[in-house]
Amino acid sequence: MDTVETPSPVDRLTITGAPSGDATEDPATSLLALPWALPLETWPREVLAALPRGISRHVVRFARMGGGIVAVKETTEELAFHEYRLLRRLERSPAPSVVPVAVVTGRTEDDGTPLPAALVTRHLRFSLPYRAVFSERLERRTLVRLMDALATLLVELHLEGFFWGDVSLSNVLFRRDAGGFAAHLVDAETGELRQRLSTGQREHDLDVAAVNVGGELLDLQASGLLKPERPS
């Protein structure tokens, strides 16, 4: 019987990325140490960082890479490259967003079973998803500050010609900033960058925000994390 040698899972990998921000190391060097031959939801605890995760339509995990922490999101190859390119362009703008590290494609399990592509972004230190901010019942003024931060981010993105398409608290990370919060775009999957947004595109983002954020606030209230408004 003939034996046919197949490439190892590592040999099949393609890592597309470049040093970003203050990073000087080629991301591929550190990324190769991660267990790409395993589905992301089964990665061993020793490579993961126990940080609060927001709600996502994809599997997302925080992993230790070199001396830092990265967020890894499984998605399609097309969407991974689309989001990576958008985040790279936004990195050069005043609008705050997470820093892209790489796209990992060609992932397979040891038996050759294909695995999804992955987008890798640098973890935003001291940031929290909105539900973690409300991990204890907080006053409504906290909510007002979060909404102010989200509105500020949306204005900044629109000024850069960024059509978000899926405005929500879930697609943002928050950091405390001078008594309030600063919002950072964390999910640009549905976004598009244009020279200039039309009035219709801006209004579409506002309509989507009203629906999505309204649903998220109702969810917070149902979970007992948002204090009900006192009657005046």
Give the location of each predicted region:
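Charged, low-complexity intrinsically disordered tails and linkers
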Residues: 1-49
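Conserved ATP-binding subdomain of kinase catalytic cores across diverse folds
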Residues: 28-144, 148-165, 217-220
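Generic beta-strand structural signal
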Residues: 116-119, 170, 181
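Short, flexible active-site-adjacent loop segments at beta-strand->alpha-helix junctions, enriched
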Residues: 124-125, 178, 189
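Short, contiguous, pocket-lining structural segments
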Residues: 142, 177, 201
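Hydrophobic residue at the +6 position relative to the catalytic HRD Asp in the kinase catalytic loop
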Residues: 167-174
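Activation-loop N-terminal segment of eukaryotic-like protein kinases
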Residues: 174-180
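C-lobe/activation-segment region of protein kinase-like
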Residues: 181-232
